Structures are given as C-alpha cells and as structure tokens.
C-alpha cells in the first residue's frame, strides 16, 4: 500500500510540474511562524478528515489547530488541539464542555515543519517558467518517521520554506495535508495559552503499543 501510494504521488508531482529546475541540493530549511488553514484528506476514499485554522510558533515548536465550524458532518465536538512538541505532550481541548485531555506526543514530526531527516529530491516550477507571475518555485523532500514507520513527502517553497502540502503514508493510513491562506506571523499568540480548565489535568497513560503523533491524531478524527 505504501509503495503504491508513493508511486501515485510521484506521478501527480510530475504531471503538476511544467518545468524542471536544476537542483543544487539545498540545505535543510525551517518554516517561519505561520497562521493559516490546514485541510487533511484521507486519500483512500477521499474523505476530508478535518479542516480548520492553525497557529504555528516555529521557534518554540507550538501548534494550535481549531477545526472549522463548517466541518460539521460528525457528531463529536469540533477538534481543538494544542501540541507542544518540545515538551512531548498535546492537549485535546473541548471548549464547549470545558474539558481537556493531556496525552504524550511521541514524535516531533508534523506537516507544518520540514522534519529533521528530510532528504531533498528535486527543485521545480509549478505553473509556467516563462511567466513569473504564474509560477511558484518549490522543493520536494522525502523521508521517514522512525517512531511511526511512516513515509512522507513535503512540498516547500524556495526561500521562505513554506510547507504547501505534505503526503504521509503507513501500511494503514494515507493522508494529504494541504496548507492555505498562509500568513508568516502568529496573529494571536494567546492561542498557545492553555485554558484554565486544562492546567490541572493529569497526563493520561498511553496504551501499550500505541504511539501518539501529529499524523495519527488527525487520522482518528
């Protein structure tokens, strides 16, 4: 399943790129602070798993995702996550009921930052290489997440290192993360402040054999 998914991704990238630029093996880059909209799609079945606004602090490695109220095709509460990658924990927040779960985060890898072990594959143009206003120059990176045995491919802009999309696949899941309406700043720093009803919450024990990471969290919504 993983091999097929990555082969399909390669074909999609080739069809989407109208001109190939010479690659000089760029150095690993770091995303800026960002505010934007993140959409998560399961490629098996085409289901939109979640879509909503996020804030990402690239310095302190903090991410807040709040699901859009437009995505109401499910009976559960709207997803609201605060992920503290440096601390290795995340909070599942229910603002409506003022409840909170605190759980371990077993991997630092996520779709809004190029993972540390990402290997550069190619630099190319999306759009037209002759009309400057109609193209975007991007890098494609690939790698794997040791903690989850998943593989990923990340599309970042050349220069700012904005992650436009991330493809992630394991033997059991295949997800596409799309990043849009990006502003390179954190507009509301208070989004990273833990709600008062979460402050005294104890860390829940992770079931044996389970790994909590950014990708699996969105797969289960």
From Swiss-Prot:
CC annotations in GO: extracellular region; lysosome
Processing after translation: Binds calcium through the terminal sialic acids.
Principal subcellular localization: secreted
Residues carrying covalently attached carbohydrate according to the record: 33, 73, 97
Subcellular location: Secreted
Pfam families linked: Ependymin
MF-aspect GO terms: calcium ion binding
Alphabetized InterPro entries for the sequence: Ependymin (IPR001299), Ependymin_CS (IPR018224)
Tissue: EPDs are synthesized in the meninx and secreted in the cerebrospinal fluid.
Signal peptide start-end: 1-21
Top-level taxon: Eukaryota
Alphabetized UniProt keyword annotations: Calcium, Glycoprotein, Secreted, Signal
Function of the protein: May play a role in neural plasticity. May be involved during axon regeneration.
Recorded family membership: Belongs to the ependymin family.
Protein name: Ependymin-2
Organism taxonomic ancestry: Eukaryota, Metazoa, Chordata, Craniata, Vertebrata
